[in-house]
Amino acid sequence: MTSFETPNNFEPLAFEQDQSRNIDNDPFTLTLDDVSKEANRNKYKIIPKELREQLWKLHFENQYTDLLELLEHIIPLCEDDFELFFLAGKSSANLELYQKAMMYFQKALYFRPDDYFVNFEIAKLFHQAELHELAEKTFEVCSHLEPANFEPVYGRAEALCMLKDYRGARPLLKRVVEIEPKFTRAYELLAVCYIQLAEFENAHNTLNYMISNSHTLGKAVGSSKNLKQLCHMHRLTTCMELGLFDEGRTSIQEAKKFVEKFSQNIALTSEARFQLALANLRLGQTKDAWGHYFHRFEQQDFPSPKRKFTRPRAENISELTGKTVLIWREQGVGDEIELCGLLQEFMLKSGATVILEIDERLVSGVTRSHKNIVVRAPEYDKETLYSAYHDFDYHMPMADILTFLKPNKSIKNCIAPWYKVDTEKAKNWDQKITSDSLRIGFAFGSHFKNAKRDKHKHLNFSLFEKLIKNSDHTWVNLDYTWTDLEFNAIDEDIKSKIFFPDIDLKNDFEQLAAVLTNCDLVVSPYMAVRSLAGALGIPTASFVRGAPYHFDFGASIENPDTFTSPLVPLSTVKQFGDQLETEEFEASLLKHFEVQIEKAEKLRGQ
C-alpha cells in the first residue's frame, strides 16, 4: 500500500492572484523578528501579499519548520484566514506532527467545509494514522467534491482494502483506471482484490494486461522500475490456481531475475521470494523453494505476527547440535498438527533439544504424544511481541522445520500417525457412538471465512445430505459452524443418521481426538479436523481446488488424479480445477467421497 501525494493541481491562493512576480529574485525576505515587528506595527488581519507569497515560497522549498514557526506567530492575528490554517496543517503533516496538522485542517474546514484540498489532507491523515474507516468516509466526501479526480477514488479503494473489503474496493478501482488508464497502482491493487476474492481469471487477465503494457505503464508517476517482474510475481498465484503451469514457469523465471538483481535487499524481494517458494512447491520443485520460504516474515503484510526474542533465530540446522531451540507457532492449528508429525525427524537430524510453543488447545495432547519435548502455550507481550521466556539458545517459527529438513515427496516415508489419544475418553465415545456399519466423521466448513477459503475449504451441508440419505452408516458431526436455521432445516430422517457429540468441537481437541479415533473415515474440506484425523491414523477424504497448498510438496499437481498428502497419513486428497462450475465440482466431489467410503467398507470387511 502506498501513501498519497499532494494533489498535483493545487495552486496557492496568492499565486492565483499574481503570477507576475518572480519570488526567487524578490528582495523581500522574511524572519520571525520581521513578522513580530510588522504585526505589532500594523495589527493586520489580512496579511500583505508579499508576506503571503513568502510563506508559500518556504512551503515549496520544504522549509516546514521555519514556516510553521512563522505561521504560529501570524495566525493569532489573522484567525479567519483559511489559507494560513491550510499551510500550517500541511507543514505540520510534513513534520509528522499529525495531531497538530489535524487541528489546523479542522480550523480551515470551519471556513470552507466543502474545500476539496482540506478534506483530502484530512483523509490522508486518517490513512497515515491507520484509521481506515474514517479515511474511507473522508475520501468518499472528496470524490463527491471532485468527481473527475481519480485520487480520492483510489484512496477510498485503498482504505477498503486495508479493511479487507475487497468486494467494495473492486468497482472503485475499475473506476480509477477508467479515469486515469495509466495509474499503475490501481491495476496492481485491482489484481490483488481479484486474488483475495478468488477471481483468479480476472486477476490473471489484469496482470497480463499490465505485463503487455509495462513499457507504457512503467513510465507513469509512481510506477516501479521493475513493474514487469512484479506483475509476474503476482501472476505466480494466478497461474498455479488456474493450472497454467507453462505460464507459471515463465513467471518464475521473471521473478527469479528480480530476486537475483536485488538479492541484497531482503525487504524489497521478500514477497517475490515467498511467491517463488509457493510456486516451486506447487510444481514439486522443492530444491528451489525452501531457501526462499525462509524469508516469509520479511514481507510487510505477512499475516502471522513476527514475534521477538532476546535469542537469535536459527539460520541453519547445523548450528543446533547440542542446543535448545524454541519452536513457535505461526500458522493455523491444522498446519501445527501436520508439522508436529516432523518433530522427531527434526530432532534426529538437528541434535537439538526442543521447546514447542503451540496453540493452547493442543498442549495436553502434544505433551502426551511427544514426551521428549517441552510443550507449552505461547506467552508474550501483546504490544512488543517479546517472549516471556529466555530458556533457549535459538528460536524458529514452526514452518522453518520445512526449510531445514528441505522435504520432498519422499518425506512421507518419515511420517506416521503420532497423536496419542486419551484412552479413557476414547472408550467413552466408543460406547456412545453405536453403529453396525461404518462411523463416518464429516465437516463442511471453517469459522474463518473469506472468498479464497470459501472456494478451497468450504462446502454446503446439502452435499453431505446426498451422501447420508442413501447410507446405512452412522455419520458423526465434526462441524461447529452450523447455524440454528441450517440445523432446524435438516430432514428428520437424515438427522436420525447423524450422531452429534455434545462437546466444544472448535476448542476441545482432547475430546475431538477421542471422537475421531472411533471413526472409520473422516470426510471434510482441507482443514484442521482432517489433519488431526491423519495424526491419529484415521483415513481421510478431502479435496483442493486449484493447485495444492505448499504442505503437499507439489504432489502430482499436474495430474488431476487423486494424490496422497505426505504430512497426513492415510489422507486422500482430490484435486479439482479452479474453473469448474459449481454443479460439475460438486458432482465430481460427491463421486470422490463415495469411492473413499466404498474403500472404507472393504477395509472394514477384511
Task: Write out the residue ranges for each language-model feature.
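Alpha-helical solenoid repeat scaffolds of the TPR/TPR-like class and their adjacent stem/linker regions
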Residues: M1-L521, Y526-R530, G534-Q606
